[in-house]
């Protein structure tokens, strides 16, 4: 299996370019459809064995997606399944029509027009529409899709569920087939890894159909680096961070966290716990003076700077803090209504990497141009609401594209949090983390991530492995902990304290 093909995310136009290159090189269209259909049939037969799913209904649309599904229908029929084909309208593509005729010649049943209220199937195969759909599905297909969704019968979708945008993952017009499994052919379609697709996708499975790594590089050029999955093997390759035998506390990262307020006192503790798990040699905390004793008692190894606080309990200033001596600075968790000048000072004076999270993002909004003047890396970690405050003109329907645009504009790394967190580099590379758990939908989870990011950045000259490693580690630990404590049992403190046990359990 090609590593590049396993992680590259493509849109409809890129798929068309790849297929055109295959056909120009001599691959017959018929051979590609046959190969795709055979791979689909084998996967579906394995995942849905005949003992539990003897009766299969195959939904056939007007194009080549329907042709792939008809190959599946033929193969399942030939091994003894009861197969019915539902074809509201005859296929437009001649090749798909030929497969339909052949299926009928074998004695297969084909239904045109309306589907019976009780079709008598144990499994649907959705081959109505594939990639490139740009508008809501019309009748008679829309009614059929609604009927399938209401049937309660599992659906195996070909390439992507019918009705989904292959770019944004949204259900066009609000209607798509709700799949139990989606068998993506060749390269991953971008839309399958957008948050909007999660309600429709089921379990995503990728099937190889013949794209080689050389062909992908030849056709897409540098575009093959524009969007990819953050695969676990690559993300955790450098974790835990290696240390030479001669390491000392000042050589393995000095980190400053600027966090907390009277209203959000726990945030300072959580960012510090997340940072501690990342293993910086020295951890400094700049906190409102009212929080200093409490946090120092919880993290005795941290060096705490009690700082003046305003009447509202927010951090007022950083007296005596030399921002040039830190390898990384984290700012924002729980800051509350601090002054914008505080964050602007950090952006201008911090010599090391800078992570802005939570209130740090809100305070830098409208002043992002200051980030372009920084020599060291900057990482912005917004959730969708914070993203809209930072970049009000960038639509979030395409989260991958939005993160990329924001990164290019701000000259910063963007960690766009969500069910599938998107990471974009200042050069425009995009990664989507396929892992994670709704267990992380808890206040304070982001504070832990901010601290972990800062800790790894403080120890890495190259920000890429630090950012990608932290995003993967945080999400994967959440999954691991949810499996042990249930989805309701992963509060932010449990997450922070579980980071290192997870990494030890997941290690070689």
Curated annotation (Swiss-Prot):
Residue span, YjeF C-terminal domain: 232-506
Species, as recorded: Gloeobacter violaceus (strain ATCC 29082 / PCC 7421)
UniProt region (NADPHX 2), positions on chain: 383-389
Taxonomic path: Bacteria, Bacillati, Cyanobacteriota, Cyanophyceae, Gloeobacterales
GO biological process: metabolite repair; nicotinamide nucleotide metabolic process
Gene3D superfamilies named in the record: 3.40.1190.20, YjeF N-terminal domain
Residue ranges occupied by any YjeF N-terminal domain in the UniProt entry: 15-217
Binding-site positions, (6S)-NADPHX 2: 334, 447
Cofactor(s) needed: K(+)
Region described as ADP-dependent (S)-NAD(P)H-hydrate dehydratase: 232-508
Amino-acid positions noted as binding (6S)-NADPHX 1 in the UniProt annotation, renumbered to this chain: 141, 159
Keyword Secreted among record annotations: no
Cited function: Bifunctional enzyme that catalyzes the epimerization of the S- and R-forms of NAD(P)HX and the dehydration of the S-form of NAD(P)HX at the expense of ADP, which is converted to AMP. This allows the repair of both epimers of NAD(P)HX, a damaged form of NAD(P)H that is a result of enzymatic or heat-dependent hydration.
HAMAP family per UniProt: NADHX_dehydratase, NADHX_epimerase
Protein name: Bifunctional NAD(P)H-hydrate repair enzyme Nnr
Enzyme Commission number: 4.2.1.136, 5.1.99.6
NCBIfam families, per the entry: yjeF_cterm, yjeF_nterm
GO molecular function, one term: ATP binding
Cofactor binding, per record: Binds 1 potassium ion per subunit.
UniProt region (NAD(P)H-hydrate epimerase), positions on chain: 1-224
Binding-site positions, ADP: 417-421, 437-446
CDD domains per UniProt: YXKO-related
Residues at which K(+) binds: 65, 126, 162
Keyword terms of this UniProt record: ATP-binding, Isomerase, Lyase, Metal-binding, Multifunctional enzyme, NAD, NADP, Nucleotide-binding, Potassium
Catalytic activity: (6S)-NADHX + ADP = AMP + phosphate + NADH + H(+); (6S)-NADPHX + ADP = AMP + phosphate + NADPH + H(+); (6R)-NADHX = (6S)-NADHX; (6R)-NADPHX = (6S)-NADPHX
Family statement drawn from the similarity comment of this UniProt entry: In the N-terminal section; belongs to the NnrE/AIBP family. In the C-terminal section; belongs to the NnrD/CARKD family.
Matches recorded under InterPro entries: Carbohydrate_kinase_pred_CS (IPR017953), CARKD (IPR000631), Nnr (IPR030677), Ribokinase-like (IPR029056), YjeF_N_dom (IPR004443), YjeF_N_dom_sf (IPR036652)
């Amino acid at each position: 299996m090609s590593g590049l093909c396993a992680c590259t995310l493509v849109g409809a136009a890129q798929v068309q370019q790849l297929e055109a290159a295959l056909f120009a090189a001599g691959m017959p269209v018929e051979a590609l459809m046959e190969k795709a259909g055979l791979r689909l049939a084998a996967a579906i037969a394995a995942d849905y064995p005949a003992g539990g799913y003897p009766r299969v209904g195959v939904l056939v649309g007007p194009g080549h997606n329907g042709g792939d599904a008809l190959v599946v229908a033929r193969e399942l029929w030939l091994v003894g399944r009861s197969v019915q084909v539902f074809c509201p309208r005859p296929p437009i593509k001649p090749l798909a029509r030929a497969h339909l005729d052949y299926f009928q010649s074998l004695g297969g049943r084909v239904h045109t027009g309306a589907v019976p209220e009780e079709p008598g199937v144990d499994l649907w195969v959705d081959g109505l529409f594939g990639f490139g759909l740009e508008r809501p599905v019309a009748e008679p297909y829309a009614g059929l899709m609604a009927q399938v969704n209401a049937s309660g019968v599992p659906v195996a979708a070909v390439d992507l569920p019918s009705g989904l945008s292959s770019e944004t993952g949204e259900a066009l017009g609000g209607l798509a087939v709700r799949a139990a499994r989606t068998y993506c052919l060749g390269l991953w379609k971008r839309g399958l890894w957008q948050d909007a697709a999660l309600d429709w996708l089921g379990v995503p499975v990728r099937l190889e159909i013949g794209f080689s790594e050389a062909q992908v590089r030849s056709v897409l050029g540098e575009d093959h680096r524009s969007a990819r999955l953050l695969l676990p093997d690559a993300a955790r390759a450098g974790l835990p961070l290696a240390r030479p035998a001669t390491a000392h506390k000042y050589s393995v990262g000095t980190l400053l966290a600027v966090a907390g307020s009277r209203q959000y006192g726990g945030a300072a503790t959580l960012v510090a716990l997340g940072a501690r798990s990342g293993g910086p040699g020295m951890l400094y905390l700049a906190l409102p003076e009212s929080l200093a004793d409490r946090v120092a008692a919880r993290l005795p190894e941290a060096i705490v700077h009690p700082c003046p606080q305003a009447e509202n309990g927010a951090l007022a200033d950083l007296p005596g803090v030399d921002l040039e001596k830190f390898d990384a600075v984290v700012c924002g968790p729980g800051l509350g209504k601090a002054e914008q000048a505080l964050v602007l000072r950090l952006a201008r004076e911090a010599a090391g990497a800078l992570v802005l999270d939570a209130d740090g993002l809100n305070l830098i909004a409208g002043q992002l141009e200051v980030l372009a003047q920084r020599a060291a890396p900057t990482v912005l970690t917004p959730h969708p609401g914070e993203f809209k405050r930072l970049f009000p003109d960038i639509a979030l329907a395409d989260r991958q594209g939005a993160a990329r645009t924001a990164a290019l504009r701000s000259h910063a790394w963007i960690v766009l949090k969500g069910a599938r967190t998107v990471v974009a580099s200042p050069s425009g590379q995009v990664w989507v983390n396929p892992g994670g758990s709704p267990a992380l939908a808890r206040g304070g989870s982001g504070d832990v991530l901010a601290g972990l990011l800062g800790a790894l950045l403080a120890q890495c000259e190259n920000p890429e492995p630090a950012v990608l490693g932290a995003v993967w580690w945080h999400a994967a630990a959440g999954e691991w902990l949810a499996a042990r404590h249930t989805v309701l049992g992963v509060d932010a403190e449990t997450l922070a304290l579980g980071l290192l046990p997870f990494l030890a359990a997941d290690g070689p």
